[in-house]
Amino acid sequence: MRKLIFLLPAAAVLTCCGLKELGEIVPEPGIPDYVDPPLPKTELVVTGLEYPEGYDWNRPETATGAPDIVMYRGDKLVLRIPTGDGYSVSEDLDMHRYIGGHVYTDYSSDTHTIVSRDGLELFRYQGRERIVLLAEHDGHVLTLGESRDGRGFSSRVDGVPVFIGFDGSVFQNAGVSPGGELRFFYRLPVNSTSGVIYLYYAVVGADCVMIELPSDIVEAYGFAFPETPSSSAAEETDAVGGIKVLCRRSVKDVQDATQMEIFDVDAGEGKPVRASGFFSSVRAGTVLSDAAPLLAVFSVSSLFSSRTAVYSGARCWQEWSRSDIPTGFRHLGDSVAGIRKSLYGSGVDILCNGYVRDTLPKGYTTMTGAALCCTSRGIKVGMTSTSGGRAILWNEGKVDSLMFRGIVTSVTEEPVVLEGE
């Protein structure tokens, strides 16, 4: 139907359909008067370490000066934090993280652990800890730290202790419950007549429950809380209900040597999973996500070959041709994506559903799994130059030069917040 701007047809519209603005199109019967809403506008937030001109981060022992932690929104620099002992900010890659619009840092002095936000100290506490989890909830900062002497850990809210373990170590998959409490697993080594064995515990808030496993489980590689657990562990069933374990049972013959299980603690039974082909041993394993679907990874090897197996939600059983477990695994819709250093020289492989989807430019590498960003809009990877040049961003095949010279530490895609919202 053509849009007519003449007076006479417009008058007809006024007569037949009621009062309409002149020139407005009236939908024909049977044609919906709506269109699909556009996707919300997003922007990329990139954090990194920016080094002074001439600094060689491949040979830091010969370099002078110190990097700054930088944060960019698109092409705009919005934050710069100097590092060094005088600022109580470390240049180590794992001692800063981007959360909710802010950069949080942790630092260990000779006597204290110091937590800062955007370069300003929030709190400090006695003892030297490495922060393995930092999260925000209702205006509070939650931390889980491991002692730098290798024994003991503590969970805290705004620096105040909630749970302290004087021995043992945090064992993967720390997170925050829907009720806003820190939840994590830890293991405690115990001497026995057969050697050292491990006892495993689940902690939610200030409550701790031992996880009882069958005696024929010879090794537990990782644990996952249920997707929507109770926010309280006051009852044992609330603390352990739905917890799953990636584990290996004792084997009767060599063909079962690589069979793994996803063991349901509450049900007391496991679901066998195994890599196809003949492999004689399991080299390593981990549970990388406790979100639905559960994502577990392990590597297997034989005399002649090795590979990495990925288990995702009981329906995605993928395998890669190398045994080194890649970094930065993410769910990508119904798929599983990851990154690893390329087998052939420099460059980075993007893995998706068991195959190498793309090999990113030679002369660049990734330094942390947080440099991988997966959203409904696709895959983005922040990459660091191995020759000392500018960092780049790989965005679904398109490569853009970033605004700083240094190491990319995280890439996050967020909705654009307009002024006044």
PLM regions and their residue ranges:
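C-terminal motif of bacterial Sec signal peptides marking the signal peptidase cleavage site
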Residues: 15-16
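Positively charged n-region of N-terminal signal peptides that target proteins for export
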Residues: 1-4
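Residue-level hotspots at or immediately adjacent to binding/recognition sites across diverse folds
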Residues: 19-421
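Sec-dependent N-terminal signal peptides
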Residues: 6-9
